[in-house]
Design a protein with these regions (language model features):
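Vicinal oxygen chelate
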Residues: 2-38, 69-74, 83-96, 100, ...
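Short, structured motif recognition centered on aromatic/hydrophobic residues
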Residues: 39-47, 92, 122-126, 223-227, ...
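Helix N-cap motif at beta-to-alpha junctions
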Residues: 50-54, 131-136, 232-234, 319-327
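Amphipathic alpha-helical segments
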Residues: 52-68, 140-144, 233-251, 332-340
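Short, amphipathic alpha-helical interface elements at domain boundaries
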Residues: 78-80
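Short, low-complexity Pro/Thr/Gly
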Residues: 101-102, 123
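Short, structured patches in soluble enzyme cores that scaffold and shape functional sites
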Residues: 180, 230-232
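Long, well-ordered mid-to-C-terminal structural blocks that present hydrophobic/aromatic surfaces
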Residues: 249-307, 312-317
Length: 384
């Protein structure tokens, strides 16, 4: 049996007594129930974009990450493009509605927020997790009051039918899915007709050719972490909810005082490398927006949530640790991609002495998501 409570904790943030009590109880019960051992790492990440944007986003990801276009699943309401690195890292399922007027629960989440509503179909939906016995996992989770879409609802939402999917979280608005697969089998999604879309393949090839020409292909590694922004009051319950749905454990939290926020990290209790199952990070303000005027505190995280809704903010791609002529790989990657017209927010921060160097891109024109590049030095596993 996996013991999720015996793994080391890091960070400097103090949590409430409520959180510490229920964290221990939740993980102990999850371990004893067998759920921790039945649920594995992240199999796939689901992203939705506006009609007409998926092909250009494939080209963007082909340049900025190790992902490559594999196939397209052509179903009644969507084109779902499967992007893959290999079977040792999660897939990306990139969904594009065929009809700009298409409406579902995910669009309704965007419609609630002033900036999110401008791109009603563009959002990160959530993760699909590997599991050993999907029906048993769902049964146990339903007993613990987690709610799932019925098969008929999945068909109406035009989602893979071999995946059980939770209702969107009230705290993060993300979903969690479970997919059963023998570890030596490839991932297969029971969804639509499997085709190779010529324009998607051409976009991928264009991005990969540029990546090769710029000399950055060998510097880019799989996803390091996925960062979701949430309201300040939902920090602890969002963590508990994700730990209840997954086999992750609470790695720890750091206060980011100058930003009036905290970075809260969960990782695989099976101690899988992040390249196999990325860390899940939750960022929240330390104080709600309604009192910021009293202390004149910054509020970038809460402002984002108020504009877009609780949702994934960025996907962090790891950059291999190394230098060329005294320059870190991350600086070479950023210079090369910036030279192709991609914007970045501020400069890289951190250093080899601090253990980490990172930078954020501007939001994608095609998905609204940000790519973070992170280069860790030596065995440093922390966060800024």
């Amino acid at each position: 049996m996996t013991y999720s409570t015996r793994l080391p904790r890091y960070g400097d943030k103090t949590n409430s007594a409520f959180f510490e009590e229920y964290l221990q109880r939740l993980l102990e019960e999850r371990d004893k129930s067998g759920l921790t051992d039945m649920i594995g790492g992240i199999e796939a990440m689901l992203i939705s974009v506006e009609p007409g944007n998926s092909v250009e986003y494939i080209a963007e990801l082909a340049l900025m990450s190790p992902y490559e276009y594999l196939v397209t699943l052509d179903s009644e309401k969507h084109l779902t493009h499967v992007l893959r690195i290999d079977m040792n890292s999660p897939d990306i399922l990139l969904r594009e509605p065929k009809d700009v007027k298409h409406s579902d629960i995910f669009r309704s989440l965007n419609d609630l927020y002033p900036v999110g509503s401008r791109r009603p179909h563009s959002r990160y939906l959530g993760e699909i997790l590997h599991c050993k016995d999907r029906h048993q996992v769902v049964s146990l989770q339903q007993q613990r009051e987690f709610r799932f879409f019925q098969v008929g609802q999945l068909a109406e939402l035009d989602l893979p039918l071999n995946v059980s999917i939770s209702k969107p979280s009230p705290y993060t608005q993300n979903i969690v899915g479970y997919m059963e697969r023998q570890t030596d089998n490839i991932r297969v999604y029971q969804h639509g007709n499997c085709i190779i879309l010529p324009q998607a393949q051409a976009a991928n090839d264009r991005g990969k050719e540029m990546q090769e020409r710029l000399g950055i292909k060998d510097f880019l590694c799989p996803v390091d972490h996925l960062a979701t922004r949430i309201y300040s009051q939902n920090r602890e319950v969002a963590l508990l909810e994700y730990l209840g749905l997954s086999s992750y454990y609470y790695w720890g939290s750091y206060d980011i005082t100058d930003q009036n926020s905290s970075t809260n990290v969960t990782k695989s209790a099976h101690e899988l490398q992040e390249s196999r199952s990325p860390a899940k990070v939750f960022t929240a303000n330390n104080h709600p927006y309604c009192v910021n005027h009293l202390d004149q505190l910054p509020s970038p995280t809460e402002n984002f949530v108020r504009n877009y809704g609780p949702r994934l903010h960025h996907i962090a791609v790891e950059v291999k640790d190394g230098q060329v002529n005294g320059r870190e790989y991350i600086d070479l990657v950023v210079d090369a991609i910036a030279g192709q017209g991609k914007g970045f927010l501020l400069e890289t921060i951190g250093s080899r002495n601090e253990g980490l160097k990172q930078i954020f891109s501007s939001a994608s024109d095609f998905s609204s998501l940000i790519i973070e590049y992170v280069q860790r030095f030596g065995d440093f596993q922390g966060f800024f």
